[in-house]
Amino acid sequence: MDVTRLLLATLLVFLCFFTVYSHLPPEEKLRDDRSLRSNSSVNLLDFPSVSIVALNKKSKQISRKEAEKKRSSKKEASMKKVAQPRTPLSAPCVATRYSCKPPAPACCDPCASCQCRFFRSACSCRVLRLNC
């Protein structure tokens, strides 16, 4: 009984090893230098050369200034987006969290939208954007 269990355990270990080894991509399989040299399909001359350029202090300062300008312009753009005028409210409208099935009028809150679920059987006005 112990011999059969030992054989089954050995077989299981070999199957696990074979499964893992067979699923490795070709790049990860172990190879020696001879096979890499002879079977290499990728030629190192095909890749473009890399040139390293040292930056001087002026170029670093210019890039910092440009980065600061971009940051300030992004902040100004975000401030402009916040100050959008709100649309005037229409008289017949649906309050937030109430039913707004398609024959009903639009939601009262300009930041809210009508959200339907269960094949448009349950619809309600919900605020989806917090910073509207």
From Swiss-Prot:
Name assigned to this protein: Agouti-signaling protein
Stretches the record annotates as Disordered: 62-88
Localization terms from the record: Secreted
InterPro entries xref list: Agouti, Agouti_dom, Agouti_dom_sf
Disulphides: C93-C108, C100-C114, C107-C125, C111-C132, C116-C123
One Pfam family matching this protein: Agouti
GO cellular component: extracellular space
Signal peptide range: 1-22
Comp. bias regions, Basic and acidic residues: 63-79
Role played: Involved in the regulation of melanogenesis. The binding of ASP to MC1R precludes alpha-MSH initiated signaling and thus blocks production of cAMP, leading to a down-regulation of eumelanogenesis (brown/black pigment) and thus increasing synthesis of pheomelanin (yellow/red pigment).
Domain of life according to the entry: Eukaryota
Domain notes: The presence of a 'disulfide through disulfide knot' structurally defines this protein as a knottin.
GO BP, sorted A to Z: hormone-mediated signaling pathway; melanin biosynthetic process; melanosome organization
A GO MF term: neuropeptide hormone activity
Residues with attached carbohydrate: N39
Domain Agouti: 93-132
Keyword Ion transport: no
UniProt keyword terms in alphabetical order: Disulfide bond, Glycoprotein, Knottin, Secreted, Signal
